[in-house]
Amino acid sequence: MAKLTRKIPKKTKRKFSRGLVHIQVSFNNTIVTITNLKGDVLAWSSAGACGFKGARKGTPFAAQIVAETAARKSFDRGLKQAQVLVKGPGPGRDKALVGLFKAGIQISLIRDITAIPHNGCRPPKKRRL
């Protein structure tokens, strides 16, 4: 006698219309993470994942491509409006926002959450070229 197999329903991906875009920009790399309002990750992208290597990962162009890639991934999940949290001193801060605009995500808020030391660690010495 053949065994009966139960069909397990396939999990459907939930649609989210609003979310948060976390942009972490350093001098060496750019990482964009898109979450829902609870903080669950919907999509992410980084300069290395987009095919940039070495010093090109820290460029403004790489930041724009990274933001577009992550935004397209989340746009497929239904994201239309987002709040943007930018962290870090890198050169791609503004271009990452341009990438989000190009992908068609409406930005309702831009907040800078870069950590500012209250005279904490000693900064690295200045370069002499």
Swiss-Prot record:
Belongs to the universal ribosomal protein uS11 family. One of its GO terms (biological process) is translation. The gene is rps11. Keywords: Chloroplast, Plastid, Ribonucleoprotein, Ribosomal protein, RNA-binding, rRNA-binding. It is found in: Plastid, Chloroplast. The keyword Ribonucleoprotein applies. It comes from Pleurastrum terricola (Filamentous green alga). It comes from the Eukaryota. Part of the 30S ribosomal subunit. InterPro entries: Ribosomal_uS11 (IPR001971), Ribosomal_uS11_bac-type (IPR019981), Ribosomal_uS11_sf (IPR036967). This is Small ribosomal subunit protein uS11c. SUPFAM superfamilies: Translational machinery components (SSF53137). It holds the Pfam family Ribosomal_S11. GO terms for molecular function: rRNA binding; structural constituent of ribosome. The keyword RNA-binding applies. GO terms for cellular component: chloroplast; ribonucleoprotein complex; ribosome.
